[in-house]
């Protein structure tokens, strides 16, 4: 499964690429930082700290000037081999990128190097000229949204990248993208990083059984907050808003398929299980068993044996391919794969709410707060006393599919929880739960679930051509088999981005369960 298999790669900072002159200044700066820290921890004389700061600023200015000169000289930097040590080796989860490059699970490899950016002059140089390490040339590969936030990027050994470039980009090149009008650089980097997402290959995925159709959009009449950007006043109005119901969502009718987040070259999103072929046979005449893809080609769902229907919003670079057939041809020719990031498991444990969601409940009373924290307080008090709570916190449960040897032993002989090791583990767990509770992570009767649009409404729009389909859910209703029919559910997005708490009624019956 994803996040269980990884490889080992170097992670270095931009100071590992300094020239000898730049390194000399850097070494002096390190000594000055140490001297300043000792002074602050010792006598903390302000005049001495100020004096050290002035010298630090002078050396920083000298270093920046040298970096700028090196950038103007357009040099190709060298990675200092001494900077790659056991301490700088990190874990990188296995992905389609690592598999394409031939990096084996738990293998130490130099084919990929992570660079932490502190000086943008070095970053600029590497982006344009790459760098050399142990006689090999490396080039800038990509950095996703998470890497941009933490000022990191991924570099790949050039000869290895060129061998798999067409596989990673499914036949496209930077030149071919620019020839068709180009695109936003940050978006391109994010989409290239899809291949570095921690995934497992979906070995039985057949691209010939897959199509891409337009997204289902529908006007919705609802209350919205309008912000006046002149004075930032907020006015709540009831108005009509166009909502992309199927944004980043697709469906699969393959028996045994589990709802999962998928990745492929230029494709990302959630694919849910829905037997649309069975629905077609039951609710539509044979004339409606056809669909038009985003390129205008007609597909016969049953005759063409279509099992996956993806939407346009999932296919990020669709405009750079002349047809879906072209993408499929490249996909097969260059040995591309679909990968799975996360699968919705059969057993879904209860979740903990977080401080963001609690902060948006600004009018809670003391009694409501006490009710909200009751389960967390009971859980903490019952550690070591209640059998089920103790076993659950130690991981010795039936639904834990990756038990350690100790957890297996606890399952056979529960009294082992009195062992010194387990008692210490429970003690640290209790401390952690208390700390989490103080930070707003409270145990509640809730679960983290994938959310998808009404697939029946989507099929009514896609196959029947209904512009305002009714589906099987009314306004204010949701469906999940994790709660009872009629339960009032607070549907919250994680991370929580706004004040709203979408309270909905769970609708469960024979039709929705089907």
Where are these regions (language model features)?
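Conserved small-residue
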Residues: 1-514
């Amino acid at each position: 499964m994803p996040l269980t298999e990884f490889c080992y790669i170097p992670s270095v900072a931009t100071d590992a690429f300094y020239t000898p002159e730049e390194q000399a200044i850097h070494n002096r700066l390190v000594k000055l930082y140490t001297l300043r820290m000792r002074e602050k921890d010792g006598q903390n004389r302000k005049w001495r700290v100020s004096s050290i700061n002035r010298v630090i600023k002078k050396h920083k200015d000298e270093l920046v000037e040298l970096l700028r000169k090196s950038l103007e000289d357009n040099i190709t930097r060298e990675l200092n081999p001494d900077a790659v040590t056991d301490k700088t080796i990190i874990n990188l989860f296995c992905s389609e990128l690592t598999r394409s490059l031939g990096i084996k699970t738990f293998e130490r490899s130099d084919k990929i190097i992570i660079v932490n950016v502190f000086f943008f002059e070095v970053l600029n140089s590497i982006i344009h000229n790459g760098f050399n390490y142990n006689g090999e040339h490396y080039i800038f590969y990509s950095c996703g949204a998470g890497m941009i936030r933490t000022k990191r990027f991924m570099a790949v050994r050039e000869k290895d990248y060129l061998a798999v470039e067409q596989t990673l980009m499914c036949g496209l090149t930077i030149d071919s993208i620019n020839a068709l009008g180009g695109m936003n650089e940050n978006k391109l980097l994010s989409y290239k990083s899809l291949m570095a997402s921690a995934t497992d290959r979906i070995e039985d995925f057949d691209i010939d059984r897959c199509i891409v159709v337009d997204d289902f959009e529908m006007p919705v009449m609802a209350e919205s907050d309008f912000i006046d950007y002149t004075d930032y006043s907020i006015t709540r109005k009831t108005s009509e808003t166009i909502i992309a119901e199927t944004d980043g969502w697709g469906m699969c009718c393959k028996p045994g398929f589990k709802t999962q987040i998928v990745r492929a070259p230029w494709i990302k999103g959630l694919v849910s299980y829905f037997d649309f072929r069975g629905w077609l046979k039951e609710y539509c005449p044979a004339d409606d068993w056809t669909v038009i893809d985003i390129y205008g080609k007609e597909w016969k769902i049953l005759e063409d044996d279509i099992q996956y229907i993806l939407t346009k919003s999932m296919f990020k670079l669709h405009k750079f391919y002349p047809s879906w057939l072209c993408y499929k041809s490249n996909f097969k020719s260059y040995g591309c794969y679909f990968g799975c990031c996360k699968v919705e498991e059969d057993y879904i444990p209860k979740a903990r709410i977080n401080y963001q969601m609690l902060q948006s409940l600004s009018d809670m009373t003391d009694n409501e707060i006490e009710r909200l924290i009751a389960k967390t307080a009971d859980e903490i008090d019952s550690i070591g006393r209640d059998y089920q709570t103790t076993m659950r916190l130690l991981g010795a449960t039936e639904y834990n599919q990756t038990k350690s040897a100790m957890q297996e032993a606890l399952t056979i002989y529960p009294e082992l929880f009195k062992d010194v090791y387990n008692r210490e583990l429970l003690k640290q767990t209790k401390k952690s739960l208390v700390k989490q509770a103080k930070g707003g992570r409270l145990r509640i009767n809730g679960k983290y679930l994938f959310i998808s649009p009404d697939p029946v409404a989507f099929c009514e729009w896609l196959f029947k051509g209904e512009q305002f389909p009714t589906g099987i859910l009314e306004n204010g209703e949701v469906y999940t088999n994790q709660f009872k029919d009629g339960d009032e559910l607070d549907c919250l997005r994680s991370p929580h981005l706004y004040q709203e708490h979408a309270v909905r009624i769970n609708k469960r019956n024979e039709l929705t369960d089907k």
